[in-house]
């Protein structure tokens, strides 16, 4: 440690190698060296706030207290979209199409993996194939029953009532130039699980209507990235959520984000709102064990992104959301 400190001070910067003393070093060592150099000069050191991810007794943890001196950038926009996954990319594409002022931040270096299949109710694709309209009240009841009555029916109704319009938006991009992709619709008996697999009597089994573009050359999220870039927007990669900010009345006014490249903090003021599209918490064992114990005790196979650590959920709860 003393030798590293001497090298840092002698070089006058963090551009050193702890072994050879040369000015070439790995990204990981460089990151640590920058912190050491800042400490050696008596500067405030910016440290990551996204870890740890809670513990075995407290999945939520404590909201980070970020020193104002550590916030070295400020961005102003109308809308902040957090997360370049399936929800965030679709929202960003819609915002770009409508010329909205927004910033899209993503903690990783690329858009997240596309979930190719999504459910729709009475979409234009279903209408083209002559599929009868769905009994929406019955579907809402079935989904609520399968969730043990613990779901928020307002969220389910939003999907039931707006998924067709969402599909029209998606298809308007994917099925036109320069992509011209073909939509695949699975519905009716083809989408129904075999009767002998059912544990309880159920008239409806979802997906009722399933849409996908899995045969497309490019994943949907990559297409959306190209689309928003064609409209003059960009994605702020390597920029993760640190915390939500709110005013004295409790209104969310923006976020504090953190660069995953060098750990500096950025205040992003959002005049009209923040959209959290951060994914779930399947990659956070503490949240899984405490919030979904059955998910960890009886599941024998799973598929999830390691990046889904529930940080957006935790940040929302810290800001006052109910879970």
Where would I find each of the regions flagged by the language model?
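Conserved redox-cofactor binding core of oxidoreductases
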Residues: 161-264, 285-286
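A short, basic/flexible loop-to-alpha-helix module at the beginning of a structural domain
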Residues: 55-76
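Dinucleotide-binding Rossmann-like beta1-alpha1 core, especially the glycine-rich loop
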Residues: 126-130, 139-173
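Glycine-rich loop(s) and the adjacent beta-strand/alpha-helix scaffold that form part
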Residues: 261-264, 269-323
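Solvent-exposed, acidic/flexible segments
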Residues: 1, 22-26, 30, 132-136, ...
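N-terminal Rossmann-like FAD-binding beta1-loop-alpha1 element of flavoenzymes
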Residues: 77-104
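Conserved N-terminal glycine-rich FAD pyrophosphate-binding loop of Rossmann-like flavoproteins
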Residues: 108-131
């Amino acid at each position: 440690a003393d030798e590293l400190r001497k090298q840092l001070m002698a070089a006058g910067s963090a551009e050193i190698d702890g072994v050879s003393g040369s000015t070439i070093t790995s990204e990981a060592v460089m990151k640590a060296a920058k912190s050491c150099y800042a400490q050696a000069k008596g500067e405030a050191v910016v440290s990551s706030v996204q870890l740890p991810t809670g513990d075995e007794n407290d999945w939520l943890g404590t909201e980070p207290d970020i020193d104002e001196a550590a916030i070295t950038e400020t961005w102003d926009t109308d809308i902040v979209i957090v997360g370049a996954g399936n929800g965030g990319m679709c929202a960003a594409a819609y915002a770009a199409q409508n010329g909205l002022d927004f910033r899209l931040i993503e903690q990783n270096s690329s858009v997240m993996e596309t979930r190719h299949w999504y459910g729709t109710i009475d979409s234009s694709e279903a209408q083209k194939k002559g599929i009868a309209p769905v009994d929406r009240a019955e579907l809402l009841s079935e989904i609520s029953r399968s969730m043990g009555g613990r779901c928020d029916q307002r969220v389910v109704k939003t999907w039931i009532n707006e998924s067709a319009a969402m599909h029209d938006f998606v298809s308007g991009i994917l099925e036109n130039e320069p992509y011209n992709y073909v939509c695949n619709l699975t519905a009716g008996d083809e989408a129904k699980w075999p009767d002998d697999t059912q544990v309880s009597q159920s008239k409806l089994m979802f997906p009722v209507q399933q849409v996908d573009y899995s045969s497309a050359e490019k994943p949907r999220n990559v297409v959306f990235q190209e689309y928003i870039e064609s409209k003059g927007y960009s994605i702020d990669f390597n920029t993760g959520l640190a915390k939500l900010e709110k005013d004295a009345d409790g209104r969310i006014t923006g976020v504090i984000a953190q660069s995953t490249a060098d750990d500096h903090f950025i205040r992003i003021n959002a005049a009209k709102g923040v959209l959290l599209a951060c994914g779930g918490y399947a990659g956070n064992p503490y949240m899984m064990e405490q919030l979904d114990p059955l998910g960890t005790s009886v599941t024998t196979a799973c598929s999830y992104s390691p990046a889904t650590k529930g940080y957006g959920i935790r940040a929302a709860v810290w800001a006052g959301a109910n879970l």
